[in-house]
């Protein structure tokens, strides 16, 4: 997977330089998923939190080396837990143009292949919403999630309605 990511990004960087294109992004936040006492997916020889951190740091280095006018920020650069609301605060505080969250899947397959990419956009909005709800369940693992998120419970059925309303309002305003 990592090899594929490097090839894909290298091709994109070369194309961007050849075309002399102007980057649409001035500030990018790279979020290494999980961390600290939240390992994410656990394999026989690795933990998601370690893989996401390594990939995030390499991606940031590639962007910095090839796109000199783009500022790269990270939600974490060491193995520590950063609560979900703080990750979004980092991006909002600097007015980031792009937020990239790196995650890995687990598989019982002995020779897994492939990758998944999710991008919030106007197509497949329902699928994007389901992914967001799944990722937001990590909120329940935080020590003070009731205080940090004003009592928000990602499992409460009424939140499906609220998520849909917010998503529709965001899409209409985009």
Region spans (language model):
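Catalytic-core regions of hydrolytic enzymes
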Residues: 17-152, 167, 171-172
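Bacterial N-terminal signal peptides
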Residues: 2-11
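Polar helix-capping/helix-linker motif
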Residues: 155-156
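Sec/Tat signal peptide C-region and signal peptidase I cleavage site
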Residues: 12-16
């Amino acid at each position: 997977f990592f090899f594929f990511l490097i090839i894909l990004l290298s091709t994109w960087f070369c194309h961007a330089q050849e075309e002399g294109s102007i980057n649409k992004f001035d500030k990018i936040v790279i979020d290494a998923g999980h961390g600290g006492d939240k390992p994410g997916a656990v394999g026989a020889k690795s933990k998601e939190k370690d893989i996401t951190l390594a990939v995030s740091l390499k991606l940031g280095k590639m962007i910095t080396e090839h796109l000199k006018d783009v500022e790269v920020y990270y939600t974490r650069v060491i193995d520590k837990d950063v609560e979900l609301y703080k990750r979004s605060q980092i991006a909002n505080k600097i007015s980031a143009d792009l937020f990239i969250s790196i995650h890995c899947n687990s598989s019982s397959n002995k020779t897994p292949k492939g990758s998944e990419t999710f991008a919030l956009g106007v197509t497949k909005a329902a699928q994007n919403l389901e992914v967001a709800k799944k990722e937001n369940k990590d909120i329940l693992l935080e020590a003070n999630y009731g205080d940090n998120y004003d009592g928000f419970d990602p499992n409460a059925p009424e939140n499906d309605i609220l998520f849909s309303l917010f998503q529709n309002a965001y899409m209409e305003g985009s």
